[in-house]
Amino acid sequence: GSSAFAIAGTALLSPAQVLWVHMAIVAPIGAVMGLDLATPGIMDRKPRPFNQPIIVRSMMVRLFVVGLFMAAATLVVVQIGKGTYGSLEVGQTMALVGLGLMNIAVALNLRFPEESAFGPSTVSNPKLLWAFGWAVVGSMLIVQLRVLQDLFGTVPLSGEQWLICLVPAVVLLLLGELFKLVLRTRRPKAHAAHAATVPA
């Protein structure tokens, strides 16, 4: 997850399941993103102030909201599994898959803070695409292979349950796109205001 709230969302998962999310899903994506390409158009922007922290306040708020969403979505998915399908194991398995898919959405949202995840830059790093692919395949394996089911306490999911797992990730991705659209809309105005204050 992106904050303490995302960690809180794993409270209903077993320690082995939490370890799977962080070591098998989050860690590979994070490692590849740490070696990612520069943000498109970065050389056209004015330099950051020398005393500006690496994670600015706006990004901290963004991470806070993302983590809160992930925690809430995880808890909701667990409750759906318990209430609709009558099994905590189903709810935990759905939450495990949902967290894996949401981490893909988080990476797409935060990789380039203002650029759309649906642009050509998304496919510019094959290693990151492999990490995303592994997150999906790994989520499938952990619920389908008997040895992993026994190890992590998961159960097979139906097609309907997989769709429910996908919903939070899609919503998170679309919310990120909406936020980026607002930032891109405001950026020309900010540049114009900055240019107006610069003496000729």
Specify the residue positions occupied by each region the protein language model found.
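Cytosolic catalytic headpiece
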Residues: 5-6, 83-86, 147-200
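Alpha-helical transmembrane segments of multi-pass membrane proteins
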Residues: 21-25, 98-106, 135-142, 169-176
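Membrane-embedded transport module
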Residues: 1-115
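Hydrophobic alpha-helical transmembrane segments in multi-pass integral membrane proteins
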Residues: 70-77, 134-150
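Membrane-interface segments at loop-to-transmembrane junctions
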Residues: 16-19, 43-63, 116-133, 153-159, ...
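Short hydrophobic/aromatic segments of transmembrane alpha-helices and their interfaces
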Residues: 11-13, 88-89, 111, 130-134, ...
